């Protein structure tokens, strides 16, 4: 603007200092808020002054007056002042009120008046109903064409087949201008609603929520899906933003913005803020050819106004352009008047005097102007009989998606005053929109979704991965190409404190990309600002941890049982041993009085059952245990040892297996309870936001998420969280850290790990998925979703998944899937039943032993003594052993002191007498006999030694001993039954010089008498 002012300064000075004798002088009246009108008017005069082909040596002088907006009285005063100076024509750019007042004045003074209507506050223009001239001669010419917006809107809603819609207008818009439109819409049966929008846009929607019920608000929301906005560009932008923020707008909303005057940047602002489809109607002007863009007939226009590269043309308003062409129209009229030599000099007119006559050259000048035909900045300009400029053209823009700028506007059709609508407002079929297009794709590196492939120096980067394969399949099916680039910050997208977004979502919002693809999850927050296709892969959160190292312990053999179990087993051994010892003692005492021979091991039923039971408990039934109590003890102990050994073997195998598969964390609950391992995720990611929402939700009943969030958000996430997934994976591989991230990503990291040192614990926490993000309101969304569903139905997506997540890879992820939390030692309560069985067996054995003792003692008392008795040599041997413990066995026994009482042999039964006599060949055997103690004898008897072995051994007592039945153990463990001796017989005896033989002291050796 400063450059323009400096460029205009010399010409302004020239106009001020022009010769006083100039015959061309025009006046101009502008409103104070129309600074550009003033500058463009001066620039137009300067351009014409430099053009000798039009005015030759004559120059145009001018006088400018500035008035307040909508002040007709001031406008008349300033116009009268200009007429007093003497003017050939009056050029004005005002509102309708001032224009009506100036029309009456110029009609009375016969001063040609070229009027350019201004937009009131940027709102759409309505027609100015000028007062008719009393004598039928109208000196006011409307340089700007009449308003034709009603005709364009009616054709537009007809083409769109709208039956019900709402029209919003602001306070600057004259509702009377819609009367003709409403009349025609009513005749067509259209349901049209009108609503005024205050300057405070937010108050409009706030009042809706406070005054309407839910049902009414839903009906209003449905009506708002089809809306025409008769607002200023700034007002429309605020209105759409407020509708989107209050969720009154939807993705299928269609906004039609109607305004003759809106710039390209303002259109882009509307498109980017709108949710749904946007249609814009604005006035356009024909463009000249490139080599004649600044030439209009025989006039060259300043490059500031005709060259788009200068940039100033985009800043001009429509009224500025018509103002320039109005000056050009006057110059051409002056040129023709000079050529015809029908020039009328200017006259000084006084508006106040009643006797003042109008300018006599006014009629001729008006006719010359009305016959003019020029081509200027606005195209063709000429005036018809009704003093209006009929040539006007509109363009209709619709939402589209360009390969460079994303969501954009394209020209759908045009409308002009002669041909009407040229083009179609119907959207093209979706299938034809992607054919041949090149889409801009933004991505983020995330294995295995998107990875950098091997690149050639100097060529664009190439990418590979699961998402790239999906994108290639879609591109092949839909026929489009794509250019891919990485997000500058490498993030997926997170809403910042200033409500803006970073990452790939920010790229889509700013229209720098058409779509975004990577391991991006579909979340409600992201769906509020961008669109998503159908999910092409399910999503869940997993835990990546380092595999636990194998535990080695030399005392691992004690691990299967708890310490209390080992203690009880150790205590049971001596208890059972003592009980067996006692029962053996009792059995030995009982055997002294046993008179019946014992059958073989399997001769009785209970013995056979005992053999079967021994085989069952893997001990064998051939033991010589005959006592019932002993069998109960041994049976209980064998069952106890069988159960203990079997349990030990099974639990040891399981314990050693678990020690190799030990994983301390299996669920999020386990992770929140343990304190040894830290855990976290990527800051400002979807997983981070999920845990924050769950952890800070007061209605969440599960305290697990609250505990997880406290650890994750510690120190603002700086302690445990990472900046990107790669850092989290590296940290998990080092150990003592659990990385919470997408299962698909961490599974791939575990499958491709060089050392296979990490594992994944899957834990589905949400029903989300991975999708393709597109710009908000993108028409490609449904097309992408349809193709993704087709890929799923044909199984192509499963093939791609198997390519990047093979079931059988170098690393096995299933080896830890069934592992328990840790190896459990069997506690004492697990073995309580076994110990109870043993205790019951021991108690039962004690009871049976007591009953046996009682029974045997009673039976011995009831038996009468018999002549034929048996001497239990085994008992005698034990008795002698006890005596030998008292050092008797260590004394030398003199051979001369040994006597052996003769046994009676006459009482032998015939069968017994025929028993063969056992001969011992060893003549050096030392023989001792042990007889029951007598009252007159000691514990030992002496035999008189003699030189010959055949000497008779006299009895030490003349009394004859009673008949005694003796038993001793045979070498095979059985008992020999000896016949009673009736008659004393001599026995040969050979003394042993060396003393007592050791065998004589051993109770295991039997002695035959």
From Swiss-Prot:
Highest in the pyramidal and dentate granule cell layers of the hippocampus. Ca(2+) 1 binds at residues 527, 530-531. The record marks 73 as: Essential for dimerization. The keyword Nucleotidyltransferase does not apply. Glycans are attached at residues 131, 200, 422, 498, 724. Residues 931-960 are annotated as: Disordered. It comes from the Eukaryota. Coiled coil: none annotated. It catalyses: Ca(2+)(in) = Ca(2+)(out); Na(+)(in) = Na(+)(out). Ca(2+) 2 binds at residues 753, 755, 757. Residues 21-436 are annotated as: Interaction with CBLN1. Pfam families: ANF_receptor, Lig_chan, Lig_chan-Glu_bd. One of its GO terms (molecular function) is transmitter-gated monoatomic ion channel activity involved in regulation of postsynaptic membrane potential. One of its GO terms (cellular component) is AMPA glutamate receptor complex. The keyword Signal applies. Residues 1-20 form the signal peptide. Keywords: Calcium, Cell membrane, Disulfide bond, Glycoprotein, Ion channel, Ion transport, Ligand-gated ion channel, Membrane, Metal-binding, Postsynaptic cell membrane, Receptor, Signal, Synapse, Transmembrane, Transmembrane helix, Transport. Residues 943-958 have a biased composition (Low complexity). One of its GO terms (biological process) is phospholipase C-activating G protein-coupled receptor signaling pathway. Member of the ionotropic glutamate receptor family, which plays a crucial role in synaptic organization and signal transduction in the central nervous system. Although it shares structural features with ionotropic glutamate receptors, does not bind glutamate as a primary ligand. Instead, forms trans-synaptic adhesion complexes with presynaptic neurexins and cerebellins, regulating NMDA and AMPA receptor activity and influencing synaptic plasticity through signal transduction. In the presence of NRX1B-CBLN1, forms cation-selective channels that are proposed to be gated by glycine and D-serine. Homodimer. Interacts (via extracellular N-terminal domain) with CBLN1 (via C1q domain), and more weakly with CBLN2; the interactions mediate the trans-synaptic adhesion complexes also with neurexins and are required for ligand-gated cation channel activity. PANTHER family: IONOTROPIC GLUTAMATE RECEPTOR. This is Glutamate receptor ionotropic, delta-1.
């Amino acid at each position: 603007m400063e450059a323009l002012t400096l460029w205009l300064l010399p010409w302004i000075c020239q106009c001020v200092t022009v010769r006083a004798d100039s015959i061309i002088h025009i006046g101009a009246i502008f409103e104070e808020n129309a600074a550009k009108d003033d500058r463009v008017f001066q620039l137009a005069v300067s351009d014409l002054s430099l053009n000798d082909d039009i005015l030759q040596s004559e120059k145009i002088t001018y006088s400018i007056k500035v008035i307040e907006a909508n002040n007709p009285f001031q406008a008349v005063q300033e116009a009268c002042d200009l007429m007093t100076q003497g003017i050939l024509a009056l050029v004005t750019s005002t509102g309708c009120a001032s224009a009506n007042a100036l029309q009456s004045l110029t009609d009375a003074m016969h001063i040609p008046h070229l009027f350019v209507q201004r937009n009131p506050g940027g709102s759409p223009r309505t027609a100015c109903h000028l007062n008719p001239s009393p004598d039928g001669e109208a000196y006011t010419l409307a340089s700007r064409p009449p308003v034709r917006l009603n005709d364009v809107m009616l054709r537009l809603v007809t083409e769109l087949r709208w039956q019900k819609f709402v029209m919003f207008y602001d306070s600057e818009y004259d509702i009377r201008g819609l009367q003709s439109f409403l009349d025609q819409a009513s005749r067509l049966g259209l349901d049209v609603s009108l609503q005024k929008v205050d300057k405070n846009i937010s108050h409009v929607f706030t009042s809706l929520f406070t005054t309407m019920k839910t049902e009414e608000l839903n009906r209003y929301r449905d009506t708002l899906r089809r809306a025409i906005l008769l607002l200023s560009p700034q007002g429309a932008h605020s209105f759409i933003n407020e509708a989107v923020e209050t969720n009154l707008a939807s993705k299928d909303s269609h906004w039609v913005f109607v305004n003759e005057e809106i710039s390209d940047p303002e259109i882009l602002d509307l498109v980017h803020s709108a949710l749904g489809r946007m249609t814009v109607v604005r006035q356009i002007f024909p463009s000249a050819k490139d080599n004649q863009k600044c030439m209009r007939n025989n006039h060259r226009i300043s490059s500031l106004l005709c060259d788009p590269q200068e940039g100033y043309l985009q800043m001009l308003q429509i009224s500025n352009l018509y103002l320039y062409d109005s000056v050009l129209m006057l110059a051409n009229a002056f040129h023709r008047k000079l050529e015809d030599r029908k020039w009328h000099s200017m006259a000084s007119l006084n508006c106040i005097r009643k006797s003042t006559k109008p300018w006599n050259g006014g009629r001729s000048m008006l006719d010359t102007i009305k016959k003019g035909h020029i081509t200027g900045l606005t195209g063709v300009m000429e005036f018809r009989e009704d003093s209006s400029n009929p040539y006007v053209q509109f363009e209709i823009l619709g939402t589209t998606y360009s390969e460079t700028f994303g969501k954009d506007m394209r020209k759908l059709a045009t409308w002009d005053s002669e041909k009407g609508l040229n083009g179609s407002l119907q959207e093209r079929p979706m299938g034809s929109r992607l054919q041949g297009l090149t889409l801009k794709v933004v991505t983020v590196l995330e294995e295995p979704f998107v990875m950098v492939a091997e690149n050639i120096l100097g060529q664009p980067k190439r990418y590979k991965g699961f998402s790239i394969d999906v994108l290639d399949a879609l591109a092949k099916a839909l026929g489009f190409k794509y250019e891919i680039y990485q997000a500058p910050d490498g993030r997926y997208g997170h809403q910042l404190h200033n409500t803006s977004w970073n990452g790939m979502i920010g790229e889509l919002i700013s229209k720098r990309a058409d779509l975004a693809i990577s391991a991006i999850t579909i979340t409600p927050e992201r769906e509020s600002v961008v669109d998503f296709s159908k999910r092409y892969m399910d999503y869940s959160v997993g835990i990546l941890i380092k595999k636990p190292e194998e535990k080695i312990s030399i005392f691992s053999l004690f691990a299967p049982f708890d310490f209390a179990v080992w203690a009880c087993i150790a205590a049971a051994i001596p208890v059972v041993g003592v009980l067996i010892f006692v029962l053996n003692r009792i059995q030995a005492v009982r055997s002294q009085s046993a008179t019946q021979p014992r059958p073989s091991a399997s001769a009785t039923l209970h013995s056979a059952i005992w053999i079967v039971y021994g085989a069952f408990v893997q001990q064998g039934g051939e033991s010589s245990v005959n006592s019932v109590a002993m069998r109960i003890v041994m049976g209980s102990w064998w069952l106890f040892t069988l159960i203990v050994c079997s349990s030990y073997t099974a639990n040891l195998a399981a314990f050693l297996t678990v020690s190799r598969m030990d994983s301390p964390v299996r669920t999020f609950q386990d992770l929140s309870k343990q304190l040894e391992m830290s855990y976290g995720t990527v800051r400002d990611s979807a997983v981070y936001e999920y845990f924050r929402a769950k952890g800070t939700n007061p209605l969440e009943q599960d305290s697990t998420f609250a505990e997880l969030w406290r650890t994750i958000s510690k120190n603002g996430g700086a302690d445990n969280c990472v900046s990107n997934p790669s850092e989290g994976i590296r940290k998990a591989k080092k150990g003592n850290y659990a990385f919470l991230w997408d299962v698909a990503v961490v599974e791939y990291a575990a499958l491709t790990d060089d050392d296979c040192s990490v594992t994944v614990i899957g834990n589905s926490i949400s029903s989300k998925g991975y999708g393709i993000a597109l710009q908000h309101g993108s028409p490609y969304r449904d097309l992408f979703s349809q193709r993704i569903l087709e890929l799923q139905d044909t199984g192509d997506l499963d093939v791609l998944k198997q390519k990047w997540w093979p079931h059988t890879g170098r690393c096995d992820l299933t080896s830890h899937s069934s592992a328990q939390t840790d190896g459990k030692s069997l506690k004492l309560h697990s073995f309580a039943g076994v110990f109870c069985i043993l205790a019951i067996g021991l108690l039962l054995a004690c009871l049976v032993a007591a009953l046996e003792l009682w029974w045997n003692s009673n039976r011995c008392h009831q038996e009468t003594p018999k002549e034929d008795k048996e001497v239990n040599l085994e008992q005698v041997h034990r008795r002698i052993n006890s005596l030998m413990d008292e050092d008797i066995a260590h004394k030398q026994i003199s051979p001369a002191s040994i006597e052996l009482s003769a046994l009676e042999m006459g009482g032998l039964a015939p069968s017994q007498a025929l028993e063969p006599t056992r001969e011992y060949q060893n003549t050096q055997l030392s023989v001792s006999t042990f007889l029951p103690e007598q009252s007159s004898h000691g514990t030992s008897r002496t035999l008189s030694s003699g030189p010959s072995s055949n000497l008779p051994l006299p009895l030490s007592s003349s009394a004859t001993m009673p008949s005694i039945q003796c038993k001793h153990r045979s070498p095979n463990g059985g008992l020999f039954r000896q016949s009673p001796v009736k008659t004393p017989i001599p026995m040969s005896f050979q003394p042993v010089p060396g003393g007592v033989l050791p065998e004589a002291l051993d109770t295991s050796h039997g002695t035959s008498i």
